[in-house]
């Protein structure tokens, strides 16, 4: 079945992640069966809940299981019963583990009704009826304790997974504080027992390129655009910047310090679970550089003694990395992928207040760390630093990946070189798209005039700031093309788009939207207008993902429990809502090419897009077809009709994928399209078809 590409956007990596996972505290929906848009969103969220990798995280599952056995065994050895409460049970996995470990009673609560109903089916399928696990379909804060109520008695063991990349972003502090006061006995044991947050001071120009727009210049070194000071000084978005730090090129950052622990959370101690804290840690500088950011991660001590440790550290700081490297028998796996993989808990980047000061080896500085109920932030020698928020508007208008695109040196070089060749002082340029700094920079090339078509207020305000700061008198901003009179429209010689639109999710959607707008405005423009880009194409390559495919893999059995009921629920809702091509930042997910890239389609942008068109073909898997678990898809825009690489902007691989021996190097400023293959092709052939619908402005993909 062909379905429309996903319009939800998924996890934006450079912005925020909102995956629903199997054992988290989920949003309550009042109308699970609605056919409205909210009903569609609900079905999609159910579908995505198992597409997170939670139950495929074997280390996480095994260490929760070990901690339950140790904790329950500890109580029994002391002659005490073990009464377990599982908050946010999700699939019911942790509750079933608790029963298997010998718990005397288990109460599970789950507020998300469709998931709670599914957990009930999972428990029954594994032989755990209401006499073994009492399932309460409520939020933990609504649970009542007492004879004849939700819980007959308070629990003395709490097992839960309330964490996200930022540790406390899902409300762990408030949930634990409530449970400790109302649902748990004094002196109770919690699984996990405690958490530690770590920070590492770094200089990382790559990360900064996702935070601050650089000065824009041409090949001759002429400065075309400078960045307004309020944008440079702004601390940026308050949204967590969750990243697979292990996939950062080692040459892309300079570790100025060793990792240091900055916060500890003892989950069984209500008094120590403060909503707001500040810590000051002296840090010794081990390498010189400018302090630009902090890399953050955390670990969990799963049991009271701390004998079971679950770490979310990147590979260079992971406690098991050395032993895993020594025991590795597969030389094709990059060493940064030897540590256990997970996508539900990653690491995060926090930007420090802007400075040009360089730290030197041996210097000691104070790292200030802060947290409130939901978030973290960091500073240097800044004991009164307020929480991060955008004060300039730029980081609200544009995502981090968009800022990365604006700073893409190769993209800017090719675009400006071409624009300088075809434009002159008589040119009048209409720029279509959101937040095009290249469009603003055209004004500095000496053209007659530039009109920026910016319907969105936020983006329009940001572009106005750039125009004022750079003193560009020949650049005007329009909210609607109707603001131009007939003589002004008649003077337009070129229409330019990067193309970029904030509403686009998959790369080619930018080009399609540009083409659709061109079709609308063409009748009011001079007949000999030049349109840039000239055309766009979509390409794909069959790949082997090392890990990404796990987000779409069926659960089957997990730690000896049958979770097929979960699989059936997920599949049912996925068939209704999910697209065969989803957006993912593939630089974070290593993949190997298993064949030669194919061009799936090509469409003109200098002419009207067709009403409909169909393309068909097949991939020949030249290497290890049995390993094929995905198709990676990307778009290229072509500024002219020459087909030259020098006039092509690509959102895909940075170099040839021909050898297949090394992971593909992806453009880190774009999310590419991904189709996850459920079953590897036996004959080494994957058939594909793409249908373009001009009226709906969409491409429909099918892979067989």
Swiss-Prot record:
UniProt entry tagged with the keyword DNA-binding: no
Biased composition annotated in UniProt, kind: Polar residues: 644-654
EC number of this enzyme: 2.1.1.-
Keyword set includes Transferase: yes
Single GO BP term: peptidyl-arginine methylation
Spans through the membrane: none
Ranges for domain SAM-dependent MTase PRMT-type: 30-377, 380-704
Domain of life: Eukaryota
EC class (word): transferase
MF-aspect GO terms: histone methyltransferase activity; protein-arginine omega-N symmetric methyltransferase activity
InterPro entries on file: Arg_MeTrfase, MeTrfase_PRMT7, PRMT_dom, SAM-dependent_MTases_sf
Keywords assigned: Methyltransferase, Repeat, S-adenosyl-L-methionine, Transferase
Pfam families: PrmA, PRMT_C
Region Disordered, residue ranges: 642-661
Summary of the function given for this chain in its UniProt record: Essential arginine methyltransferase that can both catalyze the formation of omega-N monomethylarginine (MMA) and symmetrical dimethylarginine (sDMA). Specifically mediates the symmetrical dimethylation of arginine residues in the small nuclear ribonucleoproteins SmD1 and SmD3.
Family: Belongs to the class I-like SAM-binding methyltransferase superfamily. Protein arginine N-methyltransferase family. PRMT7 subfamily.
Protein name according to UniProt: Protein arginine N-methyltransferase 7
Phylogenetic placement of the source organism: Eukaryota, Metazoa, Ecdysozoa, Arthropoda, Hexapoda
Gene name of the encoded protein: Art7
